[in-house]
Amino acid sequence: MKFSPIIIGTMRWGIWGANHSIKNVQKLIETSLTEELTTFDHADLYGDYTTEKLFGDAFSEMKIKREDVQFISKCGIEMPCENRNFKIKSYNYSKEHILNSVQNSLENLKTDYLD
């Protein structure tokens, strides 16, 4: 497995920052790939749990082979927000939470594996 020398962070691509459209995310992906930056860093909670889906929707419309890019994701923080039933911010590293987070990331990123 080879990652690009610089990893592109997506934390502020969604509602926590620029609130990019699908088209803008596609431009960011294209620009990254033009510079040979092929590794994209995600976390389940980015954008109140919406940024991975935004990225997945954008990427799935592009004609880029999945094996030509790397997707990294993280989990463990339960953040209160509209689309989650967490009452307080907390950390959860249980096997159940990790497996659930990974499954959600796979679905949102529209991929069958994480790198």
Identify the residue ranges that each predicted region occupies.
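Structural motif corresponding to the early beta-alpha repeats
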Residues: 62-95
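Short glycine-enriched loops at secondary-structure junctions
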Residues: 13, 75-77, 104
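Glycine/proline-rich, positively charged
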Residues: 34, 85-115
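A short alpha-helix capping/helix-coil boundary motif
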Residues: 5-9, 81-84, 115
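N-terminal binding-site loop/beta-alpha segment at the start of enzyme catalytic domains
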Residues: 1-70
